[in-house]
Amino acid sequence: QDDIDSLVDEAEQTIFEIARSKKGEGFVPMSSIVPRAFERIEKLFERKEHITGVATGFTDLDHMTAGFQPSDLIILAGRPSMGKTALAMNMVQHAAIVEKMPVAVFSLEMSMDQLALRMLCSIGRVDSQRIRTGRLKKRDWPNLTRATGILSDARIFIDDSAGLSVLEMRAKARRLKSEHDLGLVVIDYLQLMPVSYTHLRAHETKAN
């Protein structure tokens, strides 16, 4: 099964690269690289903005990182039940709703319905305990209705398939990227991802 997944992923990657006609440049001299780097500096200066990547909505964090940059790998770490998923979903909401950016979420623990309920409570400022017990107050309904409209328009794509491998996630993210130009991919959470030791050994062999 690992070999099949690997072959499918490699074939999909090849097709994707052909479709985009993206050819590697190989070695490039500094005389060609430096002008591009300087041009980027000029563009960043002209923007007059501190956030050059994907803003999270957390001001201090955004100022420290200038936003999540393309190819960044960000890991949220903490003890169990400390709010890692809630923090990640707040970042997802900000990126999709405020920044208008397509976001992919691979949820290996919670179902997509559970995540949607969490986000509705967050956006609508409704106590999640009242949602769970069904003891909603009259003032909660307009807030939930407003939150439903906002969340429905957000370009958030959730996959709660259990046991997704790294190869499967990469293939799905690649397809979504080609269709919606993804700006952020979130995985909740890493320890639940199955590890293909055959695939790891193949990478070790290539590295050696």
Each language-model region and where it sits:
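Short, small/acidic-rich helices and loops at N termini and domain boundaries
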Residues: 1-47, 51, 82, 101, ...
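Pre-Walker A adenine-sensing motif
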Residues: 59-67
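Cytosolic-facing regulatory segments adjacent to core modules
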Residues: 63, 90, 94-181, 195
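Pre-Walker A (Motif I) flank of P-loop NTPase domains
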Residues: 70-74
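P-loop (Walker A) phosphate-binding loop of NTP-binding proteins
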Residues: 79
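Hydrophobic positions on the alpha1 helix immediately C-terminal to the Walker A/P-loop
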Residues: 87
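Conserved small/polar residues in nucleotide/adenosyl-binding loops
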Residues: 198-207
